[in-house]
Structure formats: structure tokens, C-alpha cells
Amino acid sequence: MKTAARVDRDFALLFVVMLTIAGGNTALQSVLPALGRSLRVPDSAVAAAFSVSALLWVIAAPVWARRSARHGRRAMILLGMGGFCVSLLVCGIFLTAGINGWIGGTTAFVCFILGRLIYGSFGCAAPPAVQALVAGNTTRAERTKALTLLGSAFGLGTILGPTIAPFLVLGTIAGVEIGLAGPAFLFALFGLCVLIAVRQLLPNDLTPDTATHGAANAYPSIGGQSSGASIVAATESDTEQLAEQVAYRDPRIRPWLIAGLVSGHGQAMTGQAIGFLVIDRLNLAPAEALQPTGIVLMIGALAALLVQWGIIPNLDLRPRAMMLVGLAIAAVGCALTGLATSLYTIACAYALASVGFGFTRPAFTAGASLAVGHHAQGSVAGKVTSVNGAAFVLGPSIGVGLYEAQHALPYLVAGAAMMALFGYAWVRLRER
């Protein structure tokens, strides 16, 4: 029988696991534009590094979610944290080799992408197992609150990662310049500490309770705050026997999924290109861009979380109205970001766009959920999570590809797409 103190300790440790996986990824994302420029690799290669990682995450996450019940949740958490640490260590080693000129910049970045493949393949094993442990140790009445609090770790990670990344840049150690590779090494070290704590403190669940399981989480990325869909999927796990399977083409949810996919791509496009925009609009050297980039990303993440945690709960908005409001705000914010020329205007415009996306993400999640009955909630939640993840597979590469053609283009295209989607949503979105 677990004591209350033991339960609280285990929950705090699981919270740190989720926070670390999200924070480490977004910290690396925030420094990659500067790293790419310093290694003289194309901007599109930087985006590709995260696109392939996100693709593997989308593919592998459901597989690990199913296996967590058979192989033990603790084992899956250890696998996920191990993949996280190895990935960052590999990335740090090859980035350091490129920074010091031991290998060419292109070779360093190809090896860096291989490290990102490890993260996408194995890092996604931990979040479903964390959910399953929490779900298995709470009553149904307590579960939603506990999983929601756990899910907030991903949101906090999107703030903390870019915020602390500039302070993790290291100098020369033993004659080797670490520089911009510092965040990779330090997050790998922190992840190792978390892995050891999990191994020592979490109980070994060799005979897991198969009545509850976790659900695949969307790829933790800049701008990719949790939609809550994986929480719904996890809380519906004990009614699987009565579950109704819903197809992507089901007319009840298809308009909502389209709205989520298009708005998600807009968010991914603008978020991935923002580091390059800061460097070029402010005419900064790569190393000088870390702090202003971190400021812009932090303000954007705070704006989105303020909407999701503070504004939406106090407004009586239905999903359709929430989507329309969000699209209008996001369209204006994206266009202004593309035209901004100073740190202040970039930060304010990007924050405005983030406010808009802070409305659209939960709007499409809630709209799809309300479009079906109780027994279809788990199926719909899985599809919502897949759509969220899919946006971060192609979105970053599309955004940076447009940026290479013309710096304002990803923001103007995203703004135009949000306005077109506004028209579609006005006509097609219906609530049950």
C-alpha cells in the first residue's frame, strides 16, 4: 500500500520526466537556427532535422503506447529517457566536432539528424507510460485532473526550454570549444539524472494493470502546447470494450480535423522560422541571437498558455466561436510577424499569433470531441493527437523552405491560410 507521500513523490518524478522530454527538445530547437548558421548548412537542413524526428515520433508513439501495458510502464519510461539522453549526447558530440572543424559542417549536421532519429524513435516511449502509471494509481474521478496536471509539463517545457537555452551555452573546456552545443550536453546530463532517479525510486511494475494504459502524445515542439487529446484517450481506456471506432473521413469530425491540420501547419511553419527571422531582421551573429530568440519564443509560449490556462476557462465560448476568434487573431499576428523589423515588434506580433493558435488548438480538439458520442471519445482523441503530430512533420520544412525564398513569406502564407480557413470554418464547422 502506497503512502500519500510516496504517491506525491512518484507523481513529482513523473512530472519531471514529461518536463524534461519537452524542455530538452524545445531548447535544442531554439538554438538550432544559430547552430545551422554557424556551421554554414542550409536553413532547410535545420528544419529537416526536426521534421524527420517528428515523423518517427508520430509513427513510433502509438506502438510504445500499446507495449507499455505488456512490458511494464517503468521499463518504457527508462527506454524513453535513455533514448532522450543518447540522442542529445550524439547530437552534442557531432555538433562539437563541427564547431571545432574536426568534420565538415554538412557531415556534422547529417550525424546530428541521426541523433534526432533516436529521439523520435525512442523518446516517445516515455509519455504514454507516464500516463499509464498515473492512470493506474488514481480513481476515474481523480484521473482527469491528475493527467491534466501531468500534461501541463509539456506546456511548461515549451517555455523553460527556450528560456534557459541561452544560459547553457558553454565556452572552451580542456581546449575544446563547446559553444552552442552546450544545451545538448547539459540536457543529456540532466536527463541521465532523471533516468537514474526513475530507476531507483519508481516501483517495478512487472505485472501491470492492463485495464489502464497511456496514449500517444503529440511531438513536443515550439508552439506545440498540449491539446489534451491524449488525456481523453487515456481516461477512456477502461471503457475500451464498448469503444466505437471513428474514421478520419467521418463527416462528423472531418471539418474539425481539417481545421486542426491547417491551423497546426500554420503554427509549425511560423514557429520553426522565427529563429532565422530574429537573426536576419536584427542582423545578428549566430551566437548573439540566442537570447533574443529565447525571449521571442518564451513570450509566444506564455501567450498561448495564458489563453489555454487563463482566458478560455473563464470565457463561455463554444468550439466553433473559439476557432473563428483564434483564426482571426492568428492571421493578423502572422502577417505582422512577417513585417516586423525590431525585437519588440517581432515579440509582440509573434505573441499575438500565439494567442490565436492558443484558441485554435483546443477549439478543434473540443469540437471533434463534442461531434461524437461517449464511446467514440478514445478513437477521436487518437486522431486529434495524430493530426497535431502531423503538423510538425511537414510544417517546419514548409515554413523554412518559404523563408529561404523570402523572409516574410512563411508568415504571410500562414496568415493567408488562416483567413482562408476562417471562411471554411464559418461555413463547414457545426456543433452537435
Spans of model-derived segments:
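Hydrophobic core of transmembrane alpha-helices in multi-pass small-molecule transporters
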Residues: 19, 101-125, 345-359
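C-terminal ends and interior cores of transmembrane alpha-helices
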Residues: 82-105, 329-341
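Intracellular juxtamembrane helix-capping segments at the cytosolic ends
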Residues: 125-138, 359-373
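Helix-to-loop junctions at the C-terminal end of transmembrane segments
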Residues: 60-73, 306-319, 403
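Juxtamembrane intracellular "pre-TM" segments in multi-pass secondary transporters
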Residues: 1-8, 203-258
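Central cavity-lining transmembrane alpha-helices of secondary-active solute carriers
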Residues: 48-66, 295-310
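Short amphipathic helix-loop junctions that connect adjacent transmembrane helices
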Residues: 30-44, 272-291
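Cytoplasmic helix-loop-helix junction between adjacent transmembrane helices
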Residues: 115-154
